[in-house]
């Protein structure tokens, strides 16, 4: 069967700290075009690779990868909230297949996800509940982090499983590109934040969540004025990365260490491993070609903002 892929940056700052209207119109046009291509493909199953931002996964148990057999979006930063339509038996079968392939994939029957999962479903499909989805968490912020090689192998394992289903499969990768917003780190946290990172942050009081969101908004506003206030965006790296994906050279990323990536492009750039997993997955379907490449650094969203599609040719 055929597969389609779309990878898209996300940002909680959309609608809170937006770029100039002409930039916003440009991005919205890119997303609208991707949405049209996806609608024409008419997917029967979505595999969504996305990260978390200490809203669903914490240091009480922090897996490198987790498949949601059941999942609920919390609606942070005004993103969509509610249950994701996960086909339970299919998710269970996927987990077994991936484990048999040698990848230690965790599962959750009550996975809590944030805007990293919700935004691509909203922007590209029109809502959380439009198409059955297998939500796959890839740890992108909490050290120790999975590397490129293991993430690629995860994508390949999931791709091999879905290629046997006789369904039109849409692979989505959510996150990146270069960026380093103000995300807490366990090694530097005070007692209160440490407690939150160890798990109590899963059910934040509304007032504390609002303060947390306002800190991110304030950081973005300062970053627009002075891009020395956070790790700078890296358009050169971002474009080189997208070219590697387009040319089917993702295996070259295996040699890039987590420490090197953080130094080059920022500590939250590890979200790009969702793109790697998606491209690895579609590669198992046979020949494919990329389309719809777009990139622009957007300081207002603290992100090198990218969008890239691919489709199988068999």
Swiss-Prot record:
Active site: 115, 179
Keyword annotations from UniProtKB, A to Z: Aromatic hydrocarbons catabolism, Dioxygenase, Iron, Oxidoreductase
Protein function: Catalyzes the non-heme iron(II)-dependent oxidative cleavage of 2,3-dihydroxyphenylpropionic acid and 2,3-dihydroxicinnamic acid into 2-hydroxy-6-ketononadienedioate and 2-hydroxy-6-ketononatrienedioate, respectively.
Organism expressing this protein natively: Escherichia coli O139:H28 (strain E24377A / ETEC)
Repeat in keyword set: no
GO terms assigned for molecular function: 3-carboxyethylcatechol 2,3-dioxygenase activity; ferrous iron binding
Catalyzed reactions: 3-(2,3-dihydroxyphenyl)propanoate + O2 = (2Z,4E)-2-hydroxy-6-oxonona-2,4-dienedioate + H(+); (2E)-3-(2,3-dihydroxyphenyl)prop-2-enoate + O2 = (2Z,4E,7E)-2-hydroxy-6-oxonona-2,4,7-trienedioate + H(+)
InterPro entries, sorted: DHPP/DHXA_dioxygenase (IPR023789), Xdiol_dOase_suB (IPR004183)
Assembly and binders: Homotetramer.
BP term (GO), one: 3-phenylpropionate catabolic process
Name of the protein this chain belongs to: 2,3-dihydroxyphenylpropionate/2,3-dihydroxicinnamic acid 1,2-dioxygenase
UniProt key word Iron: yes
EC number: 1.13.11.16
Pathway: Aromatic compound metabolism; 3-phenylpropanoate degradation
Pfam families named among the record's database cross-references: LigB
Family under the similarity heading: Belongs to the LigB/MhpB extradiol dioxygenase family.
Cofactor entry: Fe(2+)
